[in-house]
Amino acid sequence: MDKKVTEVVEAFAQPIVEELNLELVDVEYVKEGQDWFLRVFIDSEKGVDIEECGAVSERLSEALDKEDPIPHLYFLDVSSPGAERPLKKEKDFQQAVGKQVAIKTYEPIDGEKMFEGKLLSYDGTTITLLLTIKTRKKEIQIPMDKVANARLAVTF
């Protein structure tokens, strides 16, 4: 059900976001406690401001209210994905090459399911990370079909 809702919302949101020269990063539909939340994440090369989030929220809310494709009452939240932006699309991974990323896998690779390191390359099927373990550096390859979650990682 949740996946279907996100796909429907993406279809509504994509033209609105494109019209405003923005990028649709992700859509989440989750239940927290008794409430449903529809979260729409937008971005652009220059980032997004509150006015852009408000414009998308207003237009998307009107479109969703008109068609009413979601069976529950929900809270709509349009925002930037933040510094730890999720990596979902091929373009996201390509743009993240050379940056710090955090990867979670469905099953262990070399005994681990969580990896954080520099994304060295992405070829569409495999991610190559450079991990720093204490003072040693280690390269690891992770097949995309094993990736459960990927995001940019902020390091201090």
From Swiss-Prot:
Keywords: Cytoplasm, Ribosome biogenesis. It is found in: Cytoplasm. Its main location: cytoplasm. GO terms for biological process: ribosomal small subunit assembly; translation. InterPro entries: Ribosome_maturation_RimP, RimP_C, RimP_C_sf, RimP_N, RimP_N_sf. Pfam families: DUF150_C, RimP_N. GO terms for cellular component: cytosol. Coiled coil: none annotated. Required for maturation of 30S ribosomal subunits. PANTHER family: RIBOSOME MATURATION FACTOR RIMP. Belongs to the RimP family. This is Ribosome maturation factor RimP. It comes from Bacillus cereus (strain G9842).
